[in-house]
């Protein structure tokens, strides 16, 4: 997962963000350690980098009206701009990610990280892992695949008769070939009789020339009559087919639902949703600023506090904040209990998360509205095509109906002509003695040749149908392959959620086992996660709901093992479990494919040696691992890791 050679060094430029006036930092692939004391704006740098990646955790410096962060990475520049107007902070720019929710939860592992805190506070771990999965999209994909499978199966059902159709056509082909062979034999026999009859009437035929001419005209007229009859029948069949097609087209046109989307209303709604999203962006940014500010106050990071309140920098405010159970409210200036501020901060954080969820829901609604608009436009295009096709078909019907009338008139004319020629031939036959039989033989020959031509045409049509049938066999094979693929995709979609939860459990358990071995917590035998189904109440009914259950197995001094709870672990142990849980989410959601950074902060509760082991272990996954550490903790890390020192005596560029 860590592909350090895939990207060049990253450069971060910051202006008026958090507690930072201006700074430039280069990050090489691998581990970068931000070393410095508390209140030296290391966390502000991490939040600025988060903001460049698309997070809402970024905040504007308290005494500035504008701020920015730029991230240069792999030949491209990503920006985040913050501006304050009438007390409202708005954001703009082109960050690395359009939606950084997954990275916020599993890659940006600051002290307030939701995955870390969920373990420490014993919150719903299943929801932490799975709430970012768009289950609505999965359900929509399942419905789409089911619909496609139904279409494929209907098409396959329509092709079920292919084998029977082929046998029928092959039988018809054999019959026609046999019929052609019989007609050719009959034609040969008649021609032989005509030749013999010609020899018997070679002499004394005064009217032979005239009779021959009449016979020729009669043969031609009969041939024309049969051709006209055949064309007339074909035209009638074509008209009938066109009428059926017209009826089908009209039914298809009538079956179009009335336009389900009012385009004007949908367009207005789209603009309204976009406007609401922009408003939420500002609100979330403001809430994040307040949450971050109060967190920094509670954590004793006085650099930002002093900068915002205009402190003289002598350190006394920091000492008071850290040492006291109360702190100065930054809104009214009175002394307030820290627990009260924590409670208010938790409520603000909940409001911020609600706004984020509302924004995510609005983004989904926006996508659905845009899809509906496109579908409505496509339906309108389809209707226009059907109307055009229906008009062309009506024109063709009119043309063929006129052709039928012309052919009917022509048939009547030819029938009268044949009757007249037969009468003339009969009269001449009486004058030419034995030539009556010859006339009859010519008539029979004409009928046989006409039948032979017709049968050959029928055979050619059968061959064409067999060729078309071969194409339909190819289509059936393709549809069968598509059905198999759709079934596989459908099964994958149906099992995706369960697969994700199973992968999360497996990843956490494997990583936890590895980390416990690395860190050497002697009194912890095992920490493992289990997926369980529990009946919970939702409204008035109880439903089965998946949950993650965290198990902690300890060993006593006597060697006995027993299961314990998370609240009995030391702060160091709880932080390690929280970090490993976040890492499991990072791996399961493949966050390394979305963003190349992993950020680490607020690990002071863990001793230096174990911090070094954690950094060494986490370093294998992201391209860039940026860790904010105290100087004494940073000393335990590998000397090859790049250090960036933070403090009041350091120049703005690094």
From Swiss-Prot:
PANTHER family per the UniProt record, alphabetical: ABC TRANSPORTER ABCH.3
Lineage top rank: taxon: Archaea
Coiled-coil features, chain-numbered ranges: 135-290, 341-503
Gene3D superfamilies the UniProt entry points to: P-loop containing nucleotide triphosphate hydrolases (3.40.50.300)
Keywords, sorted A to Z: Cell shape, Coiled coil
The protein's name in its UniProt record: Smc-like protein Sph3
Disruption phenotype: The deletion mutant forms only disks across all growth phases and is non-motile.
InterPro entries, alphabetized: P-loop_NTPase, Rad50/SbcC_AAA
GO molecular function: ATP hydrolysis activity
GO BP, sorted A to Z: double-strand break repair
Pfam families attached to this UniProt entry: AAA_23
Functional description taken from the UniProt entry: Involved in cell-shape determination. Required for the formation of rods and wild-type-like motility.
Keyword Cell division in annotation: no
């Amino acid at each position: 997962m860590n592909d350090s050679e895939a990207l060049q060094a990253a450069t971060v430029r910051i202006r008026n963000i958090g507690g930072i006036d201006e700074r430039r930092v280069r990050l090489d692939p691998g581990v970068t350690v931000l070393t410095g004391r508390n209140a030296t704006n290391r966390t502000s740098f991490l939040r600025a980098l988060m903001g460049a990646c698309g997070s809402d955790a970024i905040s504007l410096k308290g005494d500035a009206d504008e701020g920015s962060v730029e991230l240069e990475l792999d030949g491209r520049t990503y920006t985040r701009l913050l501006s304050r107007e009438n007390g409202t902070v708005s954001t703009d720019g082109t960050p690395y990610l359009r939606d950084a929710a997954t990275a916020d939860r599993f890659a940006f592992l600051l002290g307030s990280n939701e995955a870390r805190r969920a373990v420490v506070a014993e919150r719903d771990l299943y929801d932490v892992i799975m709430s970012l999965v768009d289950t609505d999209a999965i359900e929509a994909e399942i419905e789409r695949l089911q619909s496609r499978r139904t279409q494929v199966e209907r098409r396959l059902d329509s092709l079920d008769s292919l084998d029977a159709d082929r046998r029928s056509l092959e039988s018809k082909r054999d019959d026609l070939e046999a019929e052609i062979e019989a007609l050719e034999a009959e034609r040969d026999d008649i021609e032989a009789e005509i030749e013999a009859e010609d020899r018997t009437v070679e002499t004394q035929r005064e009217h032979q020339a005239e009779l021959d001419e009449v016979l020729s005209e009669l043969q031609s007229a009969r041939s024309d009559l049969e051709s006209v009859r055949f064309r007339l029948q074909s035209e009638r069949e074509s008209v009938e087919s066109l009428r059926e097609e017209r009826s089908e087209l009209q039914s298809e046109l009538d079956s179009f639902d009335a336009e389900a989307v009012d385009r004007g209303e949908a367009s207005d709604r789209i603009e309204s949703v976009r406007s609401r999203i922009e408003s939420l962006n500002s609100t979330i940014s403001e809430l994040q600023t307040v949450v971050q500010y109060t967190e920094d106050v509670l954590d004793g990071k006085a650099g930002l506090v002093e900068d915002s309140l205009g402190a003289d920098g002598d350190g006394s405010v920091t000492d008071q904040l850290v040492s006291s159970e109360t702190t100065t409210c930054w809104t009214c200036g009175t002394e307030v209990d820290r627990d009260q501020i924590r409670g208010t901060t938790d409520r603000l954080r909940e409001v911020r998360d609600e706004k984020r969820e509302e924004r995510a829901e609005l983004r989904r609604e926006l996508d659905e509205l845009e899809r509906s608009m496109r579908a409505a436009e496509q339906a309108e295009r389809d209707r226009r095509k059907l109307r055009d096709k229906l008009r062309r078909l009506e024109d063709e019907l009119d043309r063929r109906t006129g052709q039928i009338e012309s052919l009917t008139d022509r048939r009547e004319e030819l029938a009268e002509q044949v009757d007249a020629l037969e009468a003339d031939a009969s009269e001449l036959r009486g004058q030419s003695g034995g030539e009556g039989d010859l006339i009859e033989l010519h008539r029979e020959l004409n009928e046989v040749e006409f039948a032979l031509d017709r049968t050959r045409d029928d055979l050619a049509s059968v061959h064409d149908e067999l060729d078309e049938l071969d194409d339909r066999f190819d289509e059936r094979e393709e549809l069968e392959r598509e059905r198999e693929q759709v079934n596989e995709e459908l099964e994958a979609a149906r099992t995706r959620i369960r697969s994700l939860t199973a992968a999360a459990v497996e990843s956490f358990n494997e990583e936890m086992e590895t980390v416990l071995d690395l860190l050497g917590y002697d009194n912890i035998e095992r920490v493992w996660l289990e997926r369980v189904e529990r009946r919970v109440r939702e409204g008035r009914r109880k439903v089965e709901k998946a949950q993650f259950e965290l198990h902690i197995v300890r060993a006593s001094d006597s060697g006995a093992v027993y299961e314990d709870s998370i609240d009995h672990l030391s702060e160091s142990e709880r932080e390690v479990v929280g970090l490993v849980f976040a890492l499991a989410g990072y791996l399961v959601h493949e966050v390394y494919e979305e963003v190349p950074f992993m950020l680490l902060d607020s690990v002071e509760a863990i001793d230096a040696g174990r911090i070094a082991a954690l950094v060494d272990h986490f370093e294998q996954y992201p391209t860039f691992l940026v860790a904010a550490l105290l100087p004494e903790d940073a000393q335990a890390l590998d000397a090859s890791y790049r250090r960036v020192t933070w403090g009041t005596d350091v120049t703005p560029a690094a």
